[in-house]
């Protein structure tokens, strides 16, 4: 199982989502930004690192929100979502084609990563 973290960054009742680069696995799908936890990392440290590497932003990782397990065709992931706050940095995309700020309801019209769907359901209820 692959352990993955995702950031739930909220500003003015909208959430940050990012579109995976077309050359990556599941390219073209939208997702909450984040990535894989490397050996020896806590989920929070991994998330701070991924957000800096992929979006060029410094963040403060907040509360754990939820986790979800998803089976893809060739692998299984456990996705852990955390609240995150952008502290500094201008968005520079290295792993994504674009970003968007959307409401939880608007996410339903985006081609979201399947692993993120349970997080969207949670956000819509809370």
What do these predicted ranges mean?
Residues 54-61:
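Short secondary-structure junctions
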Residues 58, 68-90, 100:
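Active-site-adjacent beta-strand/loop module that shapes the phosphate/pyrophosphate-binding cleft
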Residues 9-10, 17, 84-86, 101:
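Conserved hydrophobic "DFG−1" position in protein kinase catalytic cores
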Residues 83, 92-123:
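NUDIX/MutT-family hydrolases
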Residues 14-53:
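Conserved Nudix-box catalytic region and its N-terminal flanking loop in Nudix hydrolases
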Residues 1-16, 36:
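Conserved N-terminal beta-strand and adjoining loop/helix that marks the start
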């Amino acid at each position: 199982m692959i352990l993955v973290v995702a950031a739930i960054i909220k500003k003015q009742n909208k959430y940050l989502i990012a579109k995976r680069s077309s050359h990556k696995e599941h390219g073209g799908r939208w997702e909450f930004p984040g990535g894989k936890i490397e050996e020896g990392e806590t989920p929070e440290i991994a998330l701070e690192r991924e957000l800096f590497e992929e979006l060029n932003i410094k963040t403060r990782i907040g509360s754990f929100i939820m986790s979800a397990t998803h089976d893809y065709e060739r692998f299984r992931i456990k996705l852990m979502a955390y609240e995150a706050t952008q502290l500094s940095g201008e968005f520079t995309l290295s792993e994504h084609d674009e970003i968007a700020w959307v409401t939880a309801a608007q996410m339903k019209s985006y081609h979201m990563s399947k692993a993120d769907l349970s997080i969207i359901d949670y956000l819509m209820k809370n």
